A protein has these predicted regions:
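Acidic, low-complexity/disordered tracts enriched in E/D and polar residues
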Residues: 1-45
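Radical SAM enzyme [4Fe-4S]-AdoMet core and its adjacent flexible, acidic
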Residues: 2-4, 12-17, 188-320, 324-330
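A broadly conserved sequence feature marking short terminus-proximal activation segments
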Residues: 56-79, 301-303, 307-342
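Flexible mid-to-C-terminal extensions adjoining Fe-S/redox cofactors in radical SAM and related proteins
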Residues: 324-404
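Short glycine-enriched, charge-decorated loop/helix-capping segments at active-site entrances
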Residues: 114-118, 207-214, 374-375
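Conserved alpha-helical substructure of the radical SAM core
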Residues: 56-57, 64, 68-185, 189-193
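Short acidic, hydrophobic short linear motifs in intrinsically disordered regions
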Residues: 42, 46-57
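Residues immediately within or flanking Cys/His clusters that coordinate Zn2+
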Residues: 96, 100, 104, 303, ...
Length: 404
């Protein structure tokens, strides 16, 4: 194989061996095939041999692969691929910038454990340092987060104004309760996108999460203002035990009933999950019956699927790999004038994870390191039910018992 760009992998079928079994990742058709080691070895043996040298059984196996749309000449082992793929110098594409830890709400699951008692703020000068470093890294998308960024008032406006011509995309993540007409005009002027958190279509259920009465109506009114002004916005929700999402009763937003089940970070903990949600969260055989996520596979070849393309800058300019991951950091921008990211953090993919590095599914399995029940950085996801050491899936009831 010659040098190929990581974005030009769509015609390949990647062969990944595990401890007992193997997987074929058919990127063109977005399909995954779980096979035994015997077939894996046979594929590696015959893929470059003329059929005249093969046995009838071997020819029949090749024909079966062809019938499933797999061309033997397109199969490449993960080891071969890693030797041939050329990477662009820049990997980080997005940065969260935490401008404060103060929040006017008290959300029960807050990954940042923010509240009105938290008083950390990023100074304007430090923000300038962060922007300079991000520009040097060719980062083109940023998101202002908190806490609640809008509690900063004019200070946040000054930061946004300064950054407005330096990035392709700027978004503010907010609970929406402080958005008024003045903020909407400001967002419109500087082409700022807005992400908002809403937890239910029912005001009382939403406020079970935020712990502040009246917060639902304020957020909903903010969304109405944003839409009226044609501001680009999106609504995010986290799914938790005992929080009834309710029935859709507005055309302002749509809440997910499946994605983003609460993670074990910050105030997020097992007490916010019931058996039904844990079952939804489990990685089971059915997880791989859906079309393959090619972006996850491509990023996981060399990098952690998140840490390789995103960073999180805290108020004191410490740089973490994720908004939820503070067990380790890349260092501090302020303390290092020649700041560089830690390559080992960016490349913390499933090849380095206990219980995953010998798993044939590791290339197509999305990894969220912060979503952990232990302090161990390299622990296997607690919600995974596959046992690569024996090549079998754990019974769901056994998984539930283990987690409890």
């Amino acid at each position: 194989m010659g040098n190929i760009c990581i974005n030009d992998l769509d015609d390949y079928v990647i062969l990944v061996d595990g401890k007992i079994k193997s997987c074929l990742y058919d990127l063109r058709n977005k399909k995954l095939y779980h096979i035994n080691h015997r077939l894996s070895k046979l594929i590696q043996k015959v893929k470059d041999i003329p059929t005249t040298y093969l046995s009838l059984d071997e020819i029949n196996i090749i024909q079966d692969l062809n019938n499933n749309g797999i061309d033997l000449s397109n199969i490449v082992t993960i080891e071969e691929l890693r030797k041939s793929v050329s990477l662009s110098k820049n990997q980080i594409q997005f940065a969260w910038i935490e401008v404060c830890t103060t929040c006017n709400l008290r959300c029960i699951h807050c990954y940042n454990e923010s509240s009105s008692m938290c008083k950390n703020e990023m100074s304007y000068d430090d923000f300038g340092i962060a922007v300079k470093v991000l520009k040097n890294m060719n980062v083109n998308k940023i998101q202002f987060i908190g806490g609640e960024p809008l509690v900063l008032g004019n200070k946040l406006k000054d930061m946004i104004t300064y950054a407005s011509d330096k990035f392709e995309s700027i978004e503010v993540f907010t609970n929406g309760t402080l958005i008024n007409d003045e903020w909407v005009q400001f967002f419109d002027k500087y082409n700022i996108k807005v992400a908002l958190s809403v937890y239910s279509y029912i005001d009382s259920e939403h406020e079970k999460v935020t712990k502040v009465k009246g917060s639902y109506n304020k957020t909903k009114q903010a969304i109405e203002k944003l839409r009226k002004r044609n501001i680009k916005y999106r609504v995010c929700n986290t799914i938790m035990k005992d929080i009834n999402i309710g029935n859709k009763n507005t055309d302002l937003f749509t809440l997910s009933t499946k994605k983003d089940i609460v993670r074990m970070s910050g105030r997020g903990n097992l007490n916010l999950l019931d058996e039904k949600l844990i079952k939804k969260k489990l990685i089971t055989k059915d997880y791989f019956s859906h079309p393959l996520n090619k972006s996850v596979i491509k990023s996981s070849l060399f990098f952690n699927n998140c840490f390789g393309s995103k960073i999180y800058i805290a108020t004191d300019l410490t740089v973490y790999p994720c908004v939820m991951e503070r067990r380790f950091s890349h260092g501090n921008m302020k303390e290092n004038t020649n700041f560089k990211l830690d390559d080992a953090i960016m490349k913390l993919n499933k090849d380095k994870i206990n219980g995953c590095k010998d798993c044939e599914f590791r290339l197509g399995c999305f990894d969220c390191r912060p979503d952990s029940l232990t302090g161990e950085i390299c622990s296997k996801p607690w919600y995974c039910t596959y046992l690569p050491e024996i090549g079998e899936w754990e019974l769901v009831e056994n998984s539930l018992e283990r987690i409890k």
